[in-house]
């Protein structure tokens, strides 16, 4: 017996050759592979397959998955496929075909009495987002980020201190200890960066040994060539990443000076376009260096008619500037350039900018990383057309390029890709389920370490889960010791060896960063283009390999007002 393709999609979700529109964008993805055996699909519910003696077998808990997501459409850097996903002990155990191996063929994921089921039919499954530019100004950011689909936050801060309002720095062992202890309370993977601005190694080493997973160089603390060189030397010794916000005012040198101070060592350049800070007007040149891992922050994503006006006000507040002081106003205006922001759109589409992050509450919005990424992808498709690597009638390669910017590439950059950043067997089961119509805007379900940490949920007093008001609420993995079992605190190997988790009484699972210093841009998936960038110092026009980069600002964006009426 055969059923129509439409009926099949309605029952089990799309299969090979079917196309799905992402939210209200002009982006379409096409299913490349289906792990299902047709006629042997598993689905839970009354009269459905996953029942005793049918799709559910008799195996003990040790031999079946704890949680099964059925018939999900996976979007990840490695493919766009339809599969069942099995989770065991908080990690992704299998991607394949679920069922009862006693009676069904080709089963790679055994289902038993110990298995919970999440229906993925008609849903999109992605890895949780990794935001690597966090100012930890207030703890409420964490819930905001989680509800947007972000499951890992990396950055620095101590709360709403003036230093934290401007810089992603948790300075010194005492503050590092307090923030690590505080992070035990949140269903989020968290790692902290220390202050990198010092010219002798001792103050940096003590921060790494206290738990810092990286060091941040910020112009507001003085990003001089001496500080850059010293910071990178310590990072090389202790295998932690360095992030940099370079010298907008060009006081201690120009972009060439900073690039020379890197001495070909690996570094993550924040907001590499420059509106968020960095050598004016040409920090964007850095994205052409093989040792530079370039990212954007989300307020310039994508370039719209409102971008310039918004940025001037943001900058005055975030960097403690005084609008009555002419030099402060000139400093602000030097950072905001239409030409380089427009070029940033195109450099993302070419894969020259490799990552996207928030800059939370410090010229960025913590809950909009994912949304702004896909808005940029949509704008570029409309303005530049399909990418050469895309298949006929689909945007699969573009989708893989853009999802990598906030999942696998930041994870690789900061030495945590062995734990998070993609849907791959063995990794922490930080997973996000989306209805296609709400993709990138409002997730349906967020899993942390294999347990549901947050979800859209209706009235708790209703007779079913769906009545209004439906809004985001923390779920059971956000509470008690379940939180500690399902989320990670990242620290350096030096801190782990020094017994920092035990000495501070940390209860969350501990992840150790590794491989930070060997990463090169060529390792950043689908985003490794190394253009030769020129910036005209008078007009700010940007050229990549001799080609002028310019695009018009958008007047209207998808994934915007129609999703936020309620």
Curated annotation (Swiss-Prot):
Kindly list the places in or outside the cell where this protein is found, as annotated in its UniProt entry: Cytoplasm
- Family matches, as PROSITE patterns: UREASE_1, UREASE_2, UREASE_3
Protein EC: 3.5.1.5
Q: Which InterPro entries match?
A: Amidohydro-rel, Metal-dep_hydrolase_composite, Metal_Hydrolase, Urease_alpha_N_dom, Urease_alpha_subunit, Urease_AS, Urease_asu, Urease_asu_c
As its record notes, the protein acts as a catalyst of: urea + 2 H2O + H(+) = hydrogencarbonate + 2 NH4(+)
PTM annotation (N6-carboxylysine): residues: 216
Q: How does it assemble?
A: May form a heterohexamer of 3 UreC (alpha) and 3 UreAB (gamma/beta) subunits. May also form a heterotrimer of UreA (gamma), UreB (beta) and UreC (alpha) subunits. Three heterotrimers associate to form the active enzyme.
Protein's name according to its UniProt entry: Urease subunit alpha
Q: Which organism is it from?
A: Pseudomonas savastanoi pv. phaseolicola (strain 1448A / Race 6)
